[in-house]
Every structure is written in C-alpha cells, then in structure tokens.
C-alpha cells in the first residue's frame, strides 16, 4: 500500500485516511497527508476508561525543517480560507503495519513512522533524517487538546501547567489528566499561552457539524542536525507516566513481532520462502492486510477482564450485534479461539431478562438493551464456535443456561427498555413499538424512528427458528427439552412459510404488512438452520429478487430502487444522513448474508444442472468480491480497512465510519472461501 508523489495530489489525498489502534479502544488516525479533516482525527485518541471515554490528547505533531536559516513547513493544516503547503514536500505514503511518511527538502530526506504501544495509551513517532550538505534544524510542535472525541473545543486560551524533568515533559490541560512527552534528542522550548486557532475540519462541515476548533500548543522541540548527518529521533506522547526508558523503535519492533506471530498462528499464510508464484505472493499480502485490519477492532475490556470488538472507527464502541456478525471473520477464521471465548463471556456478562446488552454507554459503561436481534445472533455464533473449537465443556458450563434464559424470556415476553418482545400464538416473535428501534435498522432522528420495523420482522423470526434448532441440538442429553425446542421450531417454521411469502413481489415481507424489498429476508436462507428450505421455489425466487434489486459490487442496498423514500447517496446534515442510512444506502456486511444464501443453494439444490449453475455463481461471486475489495482496501477511503457503508450509485464512494468491523470480517470470510 504505497502512494508515490504523483498519488498525493491534494484533493484526492485528503479523501484517503489511515488508522492505527492500541487494543483497548484508543487509536491514531488522519489523512495520508497528515492533515486532519475530522474532529475524530488525532495522533493519540485515548480511552480514559478503556474502551470508553475516548479523549483527544495529541491532535498533530507539526514539523518544520530549517536549512541554512531557511524554514520549510512539512505539515499540512487546513483553515477556512487556506491550506498550508507542507504536502508539496511529501514524496510518499506507505501503510502496512503502520503509516510511513517520506519528505524531501532540498537535499535533506526525512522519514516519519507513527505507531502505538499495544494495550497502552501511548503514541510514538520515529523520525529518520538523512541530512544534506548544510546544517539543519528539525522543529516539532505538539498540537494538543483534552476533550471528548465527539466534541469540539472553542477555548481561546487553555489553562496549561508544565513540569520538565530532563527530557520528560508533563503537561496538564485545564482539569485533564497529566500528559507525558519524551524525546530522544534536542531541546524543549516552553510556549506561553500559545493557541492554534480555527483548525478547519472539512468532513465535519459536510456532516453538518461545527467545523472549527482551537488547540493548545504548549511548546516546541528543536533538534540540531549536522551536515551529512544521519539521525534518528524518537518522540513519545502518553498518558502512561513511566516513559523515560521507552523508545519508538522498540514499540515498532514489538508490533511487527506481534503481527508476525499472529500470521503464523492463523496458518493462513503460505510461509514457504522460495518458489512462490506471483499469485501466491499477492494472495498472502491480501490476507495479511485483512488480518491487520481485523486485529484493529479486537479490544481488551480491562474492567471486565474480557475481550470485545469495536464496531467501527472512529466513533463507535463495541456493539454486541456487530460483534457477533464479525465473530467468525475476526476471531474464528484467524484461530483466535481464546479471545473468541472471552468475547462470548462479554456478550452474556450483563444478560438481563433474556437480553444481552447491545452495547455500553460511552460515559459510564452502563449496559444498553436496545436490541431484539443480538441475543438471537448469539446462538449462531455459539454454533460456529463449537464447529471450530469443539469446546463443548465451555458451552455447556458457561453458555447453555444463558441461552436457555433467552428462549424462555422471548417466549414469555420482555418489556425491558420498551423492547416489547414476545412469542405470539402462531409461534412467531413480535418486537418493538413505533418508536423502538431494536433491529439493526435502528436510525432515529429527534426521537423518531426513521425505519420503524415493529411487529413481526423477517430476520428476527429467521433467527428465532435458528436459535430453537440450535438449542434442540445442544439439549441432546435432555430429550424432553430437545423435543420442546423442536416443537416450537416447527410451529415457527409453519407460520413463517405461510405468512412471510409475498407472492406478488416474489420475495418475503420485511415485516408482516410491509412489502418493501429489503435485504433482511436473506436471514431466512443464510443461517445454520434456514427457516426456508433452500431447495424450495420460494427460497430461490426470493434470492433472485434480492440479487436483481439489491446487489452491487460493494454490498447490498438497504431498499430497492423505486420504493418510497429511496435514497442512494449518503450526504448532508444529521437528519439527511439518518434518513438515508437504511433507505437504499449500500452496506458491505450484507455480502456475508448473500454469500451464505448462495452457498446454501449451491449445496442443497437437488436438480444437478441447477446446482451446477449455483456452484458457478458462487465461485464467480467470491472472485468478484476478492477483486473488488483487494483494490478497495489498498486504494480508497481508510487505507488498510473497509468502510461502514457506500453510496448506491457509481463511483460507490465509501461513507460512514472509515473502518467497520463487520465489513472487514464478512469480506474476509468470503475471500477465504476454499
């Protein structure tokens, strides 16, 4: 993933971003020019209570180089009416394990590597200078803040206190925690009430948010470089106090070793040193890119002593719905089985009245129970976990009772947080109210549901049937229980087949009474136990309707073109974006449902000719997804990851969260099709 000078033209380069993470919810992110275009950008965004209370600490490190008294600014900053010119000195940007920037000024070459220490709120920047024939001076100015990641700081002055102990600087901004900086060379010059005014975030303006922000500039570093000298400078900024002995080279080495061990453990990389074909080399590069992308979302939850999965950067925390959909691609395929077990423990840790939390609040880690599907998705991933690990002991001892409580409560009724979940007399699950958004299509604006899906939703009942069948399978040592689960499953299936088929539109109702064509109907075919017989005409008819109306290269549209309120471009202020979120915009993770469904047809169709056709379509689909996203992960949006959503018309621009767990996980799962 290398961008040469010709690839760094301002307008296009500002649309390309990068991200690195620290395994506890913190991250560093910006554009490939180092210009911050979002309030979420920064070299150190640190969770004060991991993974929550994320706080912007170090926005940027602005570099200048002085050669024979001539000062050249290497940084690129954006104001409302200006863009500084540092990008003109940039020669390249590379992103593999971490971002690498290269600059050239006269005959002096500068390389910068940005990294994060794993499981610590620490960012490191390593500079390598190859000086030319003149004496030079590198000047580094930390642009700092201390505010909530979702906020903006309009302070004109900052209450700064600084303590210098050797090369270590302790900075306090307003009432924030101490921030520690350390550098391997040079002198620190303290500034007096220096403020960076009106940094302009062009992406926030597009999103309808306040685009201008002020930052504190506590001081600057000056490092002398002799003629023809080669010098390495290590800069660290951290919320961890003991950083005196830490150097950036060590952080980089540890991260590369950690990734290397991960690659070996997955057994997905061809480790043969010689005689590898060009195709094998490219395949291995692609797998490594996805493994690194996926690893960014896996986090420790120290207070729980467990692990979880961040739904998406830069603004989401861990959501159990997203975690469970990403579970196989991020944890099981890469053989991260112990972490997978810890993630399942996280899911059920705060189960209440048969509901697992959909997530936790940013401020106080309070469990939020706004989901009808997360608890049912758990069954599918327990089944997958068993297929990969055969760890029946853990499931029986730690999970079975929790799964049983989900079935009991869904059957008898759950009023918690207005979820209004219960099993109707026909065996189908009802959930929600007009303004309860508890399915994945959960957009709300000003308290009003944009896509109300209360009642009997298609995917909820497909998941309910699947959960009952899996519980019957897990209850083989109790024949009466197993029999009861099978009986409930049959009742659900019978009602589903009669009530959800929309003969007129050759598909399934999205919610009973709602004939809009949406992708949720694929759940009826894509799970371990599909509620629709894959060999049935209804299943095949539904699949063809979805293919024709919703599928494109980057995912599935959330609503068919021609339906009322259809939107195909995600843009504008909060209202416009929330309104369009599930009204035609393309979601990449839905490719996983489509893939599962096509696979069911390819393996269960009894007619040999027809089955061969599905097999060929499956092969072609996997090839198309691989081709599209091997390019996407390397060239557009967040380099080295995949976006949350895409526009539904060419050029299918990436939108939403710049890096989304279930997008990465589901595409990776498809790419790894044997």
Regions inferred by a protein language model and the residue ranges of each:
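Acidic, mature catalytic/reactive cores of soluble proteins
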Residues: 1-674
């Amino acid at each position: 993933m290398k961008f040469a000078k010709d690839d760094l033209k301002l307008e296009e380069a500002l649309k390309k971003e990068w991200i690195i993470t620290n395994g506890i919810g913190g991250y560093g992110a910006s554009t490939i020019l180092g210009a911050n275009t979002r309030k979420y950008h920064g070299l150190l965004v640190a969770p004060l209570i991991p993974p929550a209370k994320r706080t912007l600490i170090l926005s940027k490190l602005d570099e200048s180089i002085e050669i024979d008294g001539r000062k050249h600014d290497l940084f690129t900053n954006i104001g409302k009416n200006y863009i500084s010119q540092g990008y003109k000195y940039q020669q390249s940007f590379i992103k593999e394990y971490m971002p690498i920037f290269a600059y050239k000024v006269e005959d002096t070459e500068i390389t910068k590597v940005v990294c994060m220490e794993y499981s610590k709120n620490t960012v490191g920047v390593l500079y390598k200078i190859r000086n030319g024939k003149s004496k030079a001076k590198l000047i580094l100015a930390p642009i700092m803040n201390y505010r909530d990641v979702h906020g903006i700081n309009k302070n004109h002055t900052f209450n700064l206190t600084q303590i210098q102990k050797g090369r270590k600087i302790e900075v306090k901004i307003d009432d924030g925690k101490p921030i520690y900086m350390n550098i391997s060379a040079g002198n620190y010059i303290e500034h007096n009430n220096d403020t960076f005014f009106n940094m302009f975030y062009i992406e926030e303006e597009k999103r309808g948010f306040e685009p201008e922000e002020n930052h504190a500039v506590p001081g600057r570093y000056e490092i002398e470089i002799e003629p023809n000298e080669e010098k390495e400078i290590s800069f660290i900024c951290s919320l961890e106090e003991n950083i005196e002995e830490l150097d950036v080279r060590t952080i980089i080495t540890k991260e590369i070793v950690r990734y290397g061990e991960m690659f070996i453990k997955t057994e997905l990389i061809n480790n043969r040193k010689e005689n590898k074909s060009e195709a094998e080399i490219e395949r291995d590069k692609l797998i490594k890119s996805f493994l690194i992308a996926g690893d960014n979302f896996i986090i420790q939850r120290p207070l729980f002593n467990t692990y979880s999965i961040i739904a998406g950067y830069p603004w989401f925390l861990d959501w159990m719905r997203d975690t469970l959909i990403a579970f196989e691609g991020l944890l099981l395929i890469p053989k991260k089985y112990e972490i997978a077990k810890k993630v399942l423990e996280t899911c059920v840790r705060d189960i209440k009245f048969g509901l697992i939390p959909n997530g936790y609040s940013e401020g106080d880690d309070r469990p939020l129970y706004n989901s009808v599907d997360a608890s049912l998705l758990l069954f599918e991933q327990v089944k997958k976990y068993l297929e990969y690990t055969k760890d029946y002991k853990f499931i029986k001892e730690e999970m079975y009772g929790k799964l049983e409580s989900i079935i009991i409560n869904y059957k008898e009724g759950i009023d918690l947080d207005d979820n209004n979940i219960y099993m109707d007399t026909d065996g189908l699950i009802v959930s929600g109210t007009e303004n309860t958004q508890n399915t994945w299509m959960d957009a709300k604006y000003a308290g009003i549901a944009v896509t109300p899906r209360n009642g009997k939703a298609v995917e909820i009942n497909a998941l309910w049937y699947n959960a009952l069948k899996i519980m019957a399978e897990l209850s083989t040592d109790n024949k009466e229980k197993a029999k009861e689960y099978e009986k409930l499953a049959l009742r659900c299936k019978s009602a589903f087949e009669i009530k959800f088929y929309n003969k007129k539109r050759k598909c399934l109702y999205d919610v009973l009474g709602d004939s809009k064509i949406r992708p949720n109907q694929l759940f009826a075919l894509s799970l371990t136990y599909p509620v629709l017989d894959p060999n049935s005409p209804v299943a095949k008819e539904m699949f063809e309707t979805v293919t024709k109306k919703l599928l494109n290269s980057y995912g599935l549209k959330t609503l068919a073109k021609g339906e009322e309120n259809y939107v195909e471009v995600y843009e504008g202020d909060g209202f416009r974006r929330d309104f369009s979120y599930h009204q035609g915009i393309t979601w990449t993770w839905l490719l996983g449902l489509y893939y599962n469904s096509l696979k069911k047809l390819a393996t269960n169709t009894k007619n040999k000719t027809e089955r061969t056709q599905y097999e060929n379509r499956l092969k072609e689909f996997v090839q198309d997804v691989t081709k599209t996203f091997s390019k996407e992960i390397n060239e557009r949006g967040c380099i080295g990851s995949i976006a949350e959503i895409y526009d539904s018309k060419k050029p299918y621009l990436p939108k939403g969260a710049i890096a989304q767990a279930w997008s990465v996980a589901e595409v990776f799962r498809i790419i790894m099709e044997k």
